Amino acid sequence: MRPEGVETRTGTSGFTAAPLPLAQEEQARADMYGLVARLLLAPPDDALMADLASLGGAGAGDNTLRSAAADQPLERAWLALSLAARQIDGAAARDEFAELFVSTSIPTINPYGSLYLAGFLHEKPLAALRTDLAGLGLARRSGVLETEDHLGALCETMRRMILGGDGASRQPLARQQAFFEVHIATWSGACLDHLRQADGARFYASVADFIAAYFEIERAAFDVASDFAFD
């Protein structure tokens, strides 16, 4: 997923300034949201599985997991995801994705905010989300089947809010926080619990743990930023 800059106009001369460089930690956040979106929106291809398997380090295994510090849940979840990717081949991971997320009737996992918040698909939470997306200059691309309240699509939106690009501006941290708290934090925990506990979830149980750990880091970071924000 290629990060894209945004251009801003300053003054009255029509001068177009290059965007300020993105801080390393912000690029890392965008990359994490991009990974979550990729894992939830489409079955993992062999290249993605190989990348995940390599991130734990050569020969990493249970000893590595046990040695991870108890106060670093994201690190433990990351290592566990890498280990899970080494323990399953790409075809089996794709079969698992299909078993969990794809069905001719009702899939095992329906990661849509409207369903969790209102009990049905295409309800008021989706309408409210679309209003907020319009305010950000974002909209679902034509031909995309998933609605905007799919958890993967919401993570892609967070990535775009951090990076900007394609006509959308980078958003300040306070606006990112508001979007996260309203459209993701309110229901993603229950959804990830369902994914973790679903029959047939092996690799994707580790995916759920990883996403939950990352969201908790985001929530804590937003809280700290709010504490230091100026009125």
Feature map (PLM): residue ranges:
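Surface/interface-facing alpha-helical segments and adjacent flexible terminal/loop regions used
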Residues: M1-D231
